[in-house]
UniProtKB/Swiss-Prot annotation:
This is Large ribosomal subunit protein uL23. Keywords: Ribonucleoprotein, Ribosomal protein, RNA-binding, rRNA-binding. One of its GO terms (cellular component) is ribosome. Part of the 50S ribosomal subunit. Contacts protein L29, and trigger factor when it is bound to the ribosome. It comes from Streptococcus gordonii (strain Challis / ATCC 35105 / BCRC 15272 / CH1 / DL1 / V288). One of the early assembly proteins it binds 23S rRNA. One of the proteins that surrounds the polypeptide exit tunnel on the outside of the ribosome. Forms the main docking site for trigger factor binding to the ribosome. Belongs to the universal ribosomal protein uL23 family. GO terms for molecular function: rRNA binding; structural constituent of ribosome. Gene3D superfamilies: 3.30.70.330. SUPFAM superfamilies: Ribosomal proteins S24e, L23 and L15e. GO terms for biological process: translation. It comes from the Bacteria. The keyword RNA-binding applies.
Length: 98
């Protein structure tokens, strides 16, 4: 698996924005990715970033209805990335509109 295929997108929610102050960033990642691969992908994608810890969450599929038919959403995996104290911040999350 290519390192640039591991990270799919950032998770922008109220709780993930609250974790930014603690140096934690939340990404949706490939379901086959393990913690070491996620750490390598984040350090390769963002220059000057050092990862201290990676926590992963497997999100189960939810049942959805379309008319009379019931289906399921895709399962996903989220990774909470904790940076070291001497690491640069990831600018993707800190960009605020002025």
């Amino acid at each position: 698996m290519n390192l640039y295929d591991v990270i799919k997108k950032p998770v922008i929610t109220e709780s993930s924005m609250a974790q930014l102050e603690a140096g934690k960033y939340v990404f949706e990642v490939d379901t086959r990715a393990h913690k070491l691969l996620i750490k390598q992908a984040v350090e390769a994608a963002f220059e000057g970033v050092k990862v201290a810890n990676v926590n992963t969450i497997n999100v189960k599929p939810k049942a959805k209805r379309v008319g009379r038919y019931t289906g399921f959403t895709n399962k996903t995996k989220k990774a909470i990335i904790t940076l070291t104290a001497d690491s640069k911040a990831i600018e993707l999350f800190g960009a605020e509109a002025e």
